[in-house]
Amino acid sequence: SLRTVNAYNDFQKSVYPMLTYSSRFFILRSKKERQEKNMVYAFMADGCEEVEALAVIDLLRRAGEEVELVSIHNKDMTQGSHGIGIKNDVMLKDIFVDAADTLFLPGGGVGTKNLKACEELSKLLVSHNAKGGRIAAICAAPSALGILGILEGKNATCYPGFEDQLKGAKFKAVPVVTDGNITTSRGMGTSILLGLELVKLLKDEETSKKLAEAIMMP
């Protein structure tokens, strides 16, 4: 009936603003909570190399670090380069990044192209680097830092074929390179080494060594 329809419309008008406010409050509260702890944000792009992402995330979480998977596409699931779906924790538009946080870029050819195409992420990387914030990238992803000038004067490594995109960097053909606030690595086969390096940097060397032993690292 018309009376029922009007009653339902009145209900929508009264409840929807409350839901909207509640959602905004949750986001703000989440940002405030994140300010109180050092975070690692892994930026997930469609076409990313799944092992490079998850090996590093897994090791950091084992070490007790707070890690969130951030969708640069602002959607719940990331589709990896080999058809593996990965559930994200948060959207890029909703995160709060402190200078003490760490930003991590998994590689993959298509994934790296998507990282480079994300203007919001590019601005965040430049800003974070200017504050001395830690940034890590693996495989093709260091090239996303290179085109932004973040590797200028730094020692760095990457997947073969991307060396010319490490603008201003001194290329090192080794598995993992840390130079100041920037850590880079070569590819899927070095992803565990990258994870252990970040554990050493964010936690301590002893924790990194214990983790290496626990996972039977040769």
Where are the predicted features?
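Acidic, Ala/Val/Gly-enriched low-complexity intrinsically disordered segments
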Residues: 5-10, 15, 33
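Short, positively charged and aromatic/hydrophobic N-terminal segments
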Residues: 8, 16-20, 27
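Active-site-adjacent pocket-lining segments in enzyme domains
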Residues: 39-49, 59-71, 88-218
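Short N-terminal binding/cap micro-motifs at the start of the first secondary-structure element
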Residues: 48-53, 77
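NAD(P)-binding Rossmann-fold cofactor-contacting core
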Residues: 70-78
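A cross-family phosphate/adenosyl-ligand binding-site feature
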Residues: 80-89
